Every structure is written in C-alpha cells, then in structure tokens.
Amino acid sequence: MSGVNDIRSAFLDFFKKNGHEVVASGPLVPRNDPTLMFTNAGMVQFKNVFTGMETRPYNRATTAQKCVRAGGKHNDLDNVGYTARHHTFFEMLGNFSFGDYFKDVAIELAWNLVTKEFGLDPKRLLVTVYHTDDEAAGHWRKIAGLPEERIIRIPTSDNFWAMGDTGPCGPCSEIFFDHGEGIPGGPPGSPDEDGDRFIEIWNLVFMQYEQVSPDERINLPRPSIDTGMGLERVAAVLQGVHDNYEIDLFKALIHATEEAVGVRAEGERRPSYKVIADHLRASSFLIADGVLPSNEGRGYVLRRIMRRAMRHAQLLGAEEPLMWRLVPALVREMGQAYPELVRGEALITETLKLEETRFRKTLARGLNLLSDATGGMGEGDRLDGETAFKLYDTYGFPLDLTQDALRQRGVTVDLEGFNAAMERQKAEARASWAGSGEAATEAVWFSVKDRTGATDFLGYETEEAEGIIAALVKDGAMVETAAEGEEVAVVTNQTPFYGESGGQVGDTGTIEGEGFAIEIKNTQKKGEGLFVHFGQVKKGTVRISEPVSLRVDHERRTRIRANHSATHLLHEALREVLGTHVAQKGSLVAPDRLRFDFSHPKPIAEEELQQIEDLANEVVLQNAPVVTRLMAVDDAIAEGAMALFGEKYGDEVRVVSMGKGTQGEKSGKTYSLELCGGTHVNATGDIGLVHIIGEGAVAAGVRRVEALTGAAARRYLDEQERRLKAAASVLKVSPGDLLPRLETLVEERRKLERELSEARKKLALGGGAGAKAGEEREEVGGVGFIGRVVEGISPKDLKPLADEGKKSLGSGVVVFVGTSEEGKASVVVGVTDDLTGRFSAVDLVRKASAAIGGQGGGGRPDMAQAGGPDAANAAAAVEAVRAALAG
C-alpha cells in the first residue's frame, strides 16, 4: 500500500467508510475567488461552505486536491530542486467537517488512519497543539495515549490558522513523524526544528472562532474541521525515504528523464532532475486546467516554471526540447487519478514543445550574456539590475531563472536595480499613452446603480417592452435631461436590450416617449446587473422618470442569435475533431460575423476544418429545438454542460442545449450543452448555414476560427463563386480546370525567376556569357577585390553571390550592392577566412551602409549584410569599401 496511487486511494476510502463524501479535486484556478492566483490548499473549494455563503448536500467531505504554490504569497519556486520537500505542484489529502464533528472525532480519525490504516509506529509520532488548546491536548492523551512530552504546545501563529483579517479561524494540531536519531534536527518548537528528523505529515485545523475585528473574536455556532496532509510527504514516510523525490512517482519521472537525456541523476546533476520532475507536473496540470504561457498573470507564472525547467534540461545536455517527451510518463503515473491529464495530453505536449522550441532560440544567447556579465564573480558578488532586466526583457529570462542560474556560485541579483529598470519601462509605456479618462467615466455607474438598482432584463422573452427612464448620463455625469442631437446613456427600470457580455455584442434599436426619440447604438452591462443604453437623441428632449417604449432592432438581433448558436455548434465540433482539450478562450458574436478563440497548440488542417464545418451543419439541418433551462450550477456541470473556464456563475445558471450527436460517444445524445447567458435561435435550422472563412493563431496555444451564418454565408459563397468563374474566364479554362492551370503557371513563373536570378548572378560576377569573376579581380592595398553594383537583385540572392565571389578570388574581399525598383539598396561584404584577422566584414559593411543612408549592419567577420534607402549612391558604397582596403 506504499505506492502514491495506493496511498491516495487508501486515504479517500478510509474517510468514505467513515461517512465522508469523496469530492473531486477543484481546478488549479479557483472558481469565483479573485483573491487567489492558484488553489494552494484543500479547503479552497469549500471556502464559501465554511463562511456560510454556500451549502452542500453533505456535511462531511474528503478530497485529494491538486495544489500549486508558485507566485504570490505562497511561492516555493526558488527552493525546488535544492531541498527534499519543496514543490511547486503537490497533492493535499484532506477531510472536512462542516458543522458536524469536531476535535475529538477529527483526532480519533486521524490517529486511526496513520496508525492502523497506514501502519505507522505510534512511538515515532508526536503532535503539536496551540499553547492554550487544552481541549485538543486532552483528546490526544485520551484517544492516542500520548504522554505529555509528545504533545508539544506551540505559542506562535504556526499553530493558529485564520482565513484572513476577519472570518473563520482556530487553533491547529499537527502530526509529526520522527525519522530517528540518525537524522539531524530537533522537535517542533526547538531551536533545531528546521532539521529533517521530525517531519510534519498532517495538519488538523479546528475552526471554532470568528474574527469579527482585530480585537474581537467570537465562538462559531457550528465549529468545523479542515485538515491537510501532503501526499508526497506521507509517501516518503511510508516508503522509508527522507527525500520526497525518492518516492515511486518521482522515481518514474526522473527515470524517464534519464532515458531521454542519457545521463544518470547523480551528484551535481541531481537538482536539475528534481526541478524537471516537479515543474513537469506543475506545467502539465496548469495547462490541463486551461492556463497557457503568456507574459502576465497566471500565464506568466506558468512560463516561469516551464523556462526554469528548460534551463535545467539544457544543463543536463539536452540538445532538443525535452519536457514534451516526458508527458507520457506523467500521464502513466497520474492519469488514472486525474483524467484531465489524459484528456489534455495533446495540448500539454504541444504547448511544452512549442514553448521550449521558442525559448531555446534565446536561451543560449541569454546564458552567454549572463556568463560574460558574471565571468569574474564569486560568492557574495551581485549582478547589476540592468543586466538582469535585459535578460528578462530581451531574452525572456524570468528573474527567478537568472537567480537560479547564479545560485550555486553564490552570486545574487541587485533587485532594487532590476525593479527600477522595470518601473522605468512601465513609466515610459504609461507616458506613451495619453490616457482616456475611462476610470473617472466608469465611476459614475456605481452612483447610478445606488440610485436605480439593477435593471430587469426581459430580452429572453421579448424584443419590445415598456419602461421608465431611471437615469441619464452625459459626459460621465448624471443629468436630468438630454436635448435633441446630444449623445446620452439611458438607464431604464427594465429592458429587452441585451447588454454586451459573454462575447455577444449589445443590442441596438430605439427608445421612444411622448415627444422624443432616442436611437440606441449600443447596450452594455455596467457592474452587477445595470443595463446601459448608449445613443443619440433624434427628436425632442428626454427627461428622467418619463415612460418609454423600448424596441430592439429585430433583424439585427436575429442575425446575432444565429451567430451565437453557431458558436456553440462550432465549439462542440472543434472538441469532437481536435480533442477535448479544446476550451473556449474568447469569442465575438456580432450581427455580421462570429469568431471563436480556443486552446489548441497548432494550425488546423484544411480537412479538419471541413470536418468541423460539416459537423456543425449536420446539426443545423436537424432543425432541432434549442432548449434553455434554469438549473443549479452544480447540477448543470454534473449533467456535462460546458462552462467557460474561470467565469463567475451564480447559484442558478442558464443551460442551452441543441441538436443530437450522430457519431461516436455523442451518437443519440445532446450535441451541444453549455452554460450561457446569451440569446439564441429557437431551432438550429434558423441558423441556415455555417461557413468557416478563416483560422489562425491569436497567441501561443490559442487559435481562432471565424465564420459566417445564414444569408451572410450565402452571399460570401456566391461572391467566391463569382470570383472563381471570373478567374477561370481570364485563363480561358473551366472552373474545374482552374487549379491545375494555376499550378502550371506558378511553376513556370518559379522556373523563370530561377533563370533570371542565375542570369543576374552571372552578370554580377563578370558580365556576359563565358565571363568569370576572376576577370573582374582588382588588387586594392595588396588584397584581391571584387566590387559591383547589381540592379534588380533581391537581398536574399546577395549572400550566395558573395560566396561565389570569395570562392573565385581564393583570397580577398568582395562587395555587392543590389538595387531595387523602389530606390532601396542592399549590400553584402564577404572576406575570405585568411583575411578575417585584418578585415572584418561587419566593419566594412557598415562603411558601405553609411553611403546608402543605412544605420549600420551586422553579421560575422567573414560575411555581413546591410541595407539603406538610397540606391542612387550604390556605387559610392562600393567605393567606401575600396577606400577602406586601400587604407
């Protein structure tokens, strides 16, 4: 029972037998909790239950919760690899009581599990309690039979837990395992407590108080229990090892890395293997939960983790991207417990491969810069902040990666200098933006909401309604009236107008009253439930408290509805064709088009796009009813409804279902089932037709499809057909023969371009037929020299030309200046290897570049290239090189 998977199962089974509901792990990105970057403890998904804001159909629960501690307040990233127990990703086993049992039962359950189920020797266990918690100490004596010397009272906050400055709180009791006298370290509370002998394996939190103010704490009416046991730690204890990275799970991941790299995980290399194994888990689980590498927020933390592992892969000698090759080993070890790894394996693999391929392009150059900057440094020295910032800004090195690279040499980074450089860049960015006053403008809506309350939205049932003008806003301030011709924002007590949200654009239409009319150009949601109509007064004077008639533009709303329903069909079709890793990352639902952004690591093949379009249109042709139901959010998710990752949902949600599947697992089942607050067609046939018009990348790991529906799709296809026939007519072939004819013409053009390029090269190397470059040779300053201006040659052809020139010279310098019809010039300088000690092609090309108005140039000592806007001075560029040689 000592394998990680066995331990996890034994823990959950034990508490299930003791009346606990086994609850699946929450996602790593907490739902509806902006205070946390990542889930970092088992109680996170129960936070609202503990505070009384949410109820569950059970009052006892147990979980194996995936957690990440990297970035923000809880950050173990810097220590991973160099200690026995630090992780960025770990599993927290826990049991919870929501007002059911309390200290005595919690202690009895914990003691029975560790001593009877896990079989740990009671003589090697000791516990801590908060120094005033006599009740807990008494239970440990009575239930576990522990003597007083093995019940250690701790007066610090280590043994008192609080959710925040206010809210539930209470004392803790921790269970420690004694590894024995051969391991250095003292018991908890002693000066040597940070040693490895006594290891905490379980923390029991007794939530019995509520902190109502800094000076006031009251008893909770229903005390609760929250416990947390680190799976990796207890596995190390049960497997008889002192390092978490020696348990079976990490052994498998490290072995897979050894096989991929071909080097044993020994000595100084061992920390790199630990880093890779840990960061592989963190990266893979974050990607599976919808986080993708980016330059901000959670995505940047993921990128930092990935790039730190990638540097350690490079230290081990990996010459190709490594991380993606280890994913199958991780899925084998953890996929059964966490099926999201299996579902997301393709996305995880491609994302890791793409990120490492990109980073490797700058990794070597960044490490060279770091080496040059710290070449003479040793213990106690500091790298200047400007260089650290350059590594971050230019080469993509997160600060902690630079710190990690310098760690073993004892070199630190000037953090003040780094932060100053970062702030300077931000200040420059802010200065380049004049500002729009949006913050001040947005503040008015809080005042409006206080005055009017939320708007009653009627738009699911009707497109016309009567209402009362509750507020008018002009130029960021509330007003009593608005005159003809003025732009105004209108808030009514109720409205059929949909406010822009969830990717769907806001409605347009009219608001009319006695003697006035307003053309509504957009509708937006402001804050919680305030619908704001933006428009222009077309007639009369508008006043608050006036009764009005509100009419949505029916034809426009109809097209929006069709496009919104089509996005649902495309979403499901994308998942069916590409895989279940596809998750919505954004959308636009407009009257004239739709676009859908989703997680996928690579371009979609044409045949896959056709499959996706065909699947969506199959459901359109079913003319199936589109059904909307109001459901409890948990019931909707349990039924299989797709939710937008990270979106905040209330207790009750709208669930939109449409169509029947015809293939695979979907056959005979509801085709599309999503949580959605938008407006939709009554039946799928109302969509008419779905046609994909584009696919491309939005960001790393995020793709976008664009599509048209109904009449817009038909007009688009009609126009495409018209153009096809016109093109066929120009080439005097039938539309069916157009493609082979075009392929023939393209190949003929390529052949002519190659022949023209060769002719220009020959001309550049010496003129007419039979001429040789050697015939153009000069002696300048005792050095062989060829210099020519070549009209109409592309910059990419100059380098091969210079190679030919160098070859024909044997020893010497060549310069070729190409000119274009646009009046621009390109120059290349080549220096044979025997002369690079005397002449640098880079120095020479910069002299030539100056003559044609260029700003320098670059390359190697034997070959360099530059450009400039002044082709009229091409000959002067040649002369500049000639003069430099003549010296």
UniProtKB/Swiss-Prot annotation:
Domain notes: Consists of three domains; the N-terminal catalytic domain, the editing domain and the C-terminal C-Ala domain. The editing domain removes incorrectly charged amino acids, while the C-Ala domain, along with tRNA(Ala), serves as a bridge to cooperatively bring together the editing and aminoacylation centers thus stimulating deacylation of misacylated tRNAs.
Reported function: Catalyzes the attachment of alanine to tRNA(Ala) in a two-step reaction: alanine is first activated by ATP to form Ala-AMP and then transferred to the acceptor end of tRNA(Ala). Also edits incorrectly charged Ser-tRNA(Ala) and Gly-tRNA(Ala) via its editing domain.
EC number, UniProt record: 6.1.1.7
GO cellular component: cytosol
Localization terms from the record: Cytoplasm
Protein known as: Alanine--tRNA ligase
Family: Belongs to the class-II aminoacyl-tRNA synthetase family.
Keyword terms, alphabetized: Aminoacyl-tRNA synthetase, ATP-binding, Cytoplasm, Ligase, Metal-binding, Nucleotide-binding, Protein biosynthesis, RNA-binding, tRNA-binding, Zinc
Domain of life of the source: Bacteria
Gene Ontology biological process terms in this record: alanyl-tRNA aminoacylation; negative regulation of DNA-templated transcription
Source organism: Chelativorans sp. (strain BNC1)
Classification lineage: Bacteria, Pseudomonadati, Pseudomonadota, Alphaproteobacteria, Hyphomicrobiales
GO MF annotation terms: alanine-tRNA ligase activity; aminoacyl-tRNA deacylase activity; ATP binding; tRNA binding; zinc ion binding
The protein's required cofactors: Zn(2+)
Catalysed reaction equations from the record: tRNA(Ala) + L-alanine + ATP = L-alanyl-tRNA(Ala) + AMP + diphosphate
Gene that this polypeptide is encoded by: alaS
Main location: cytoplasm
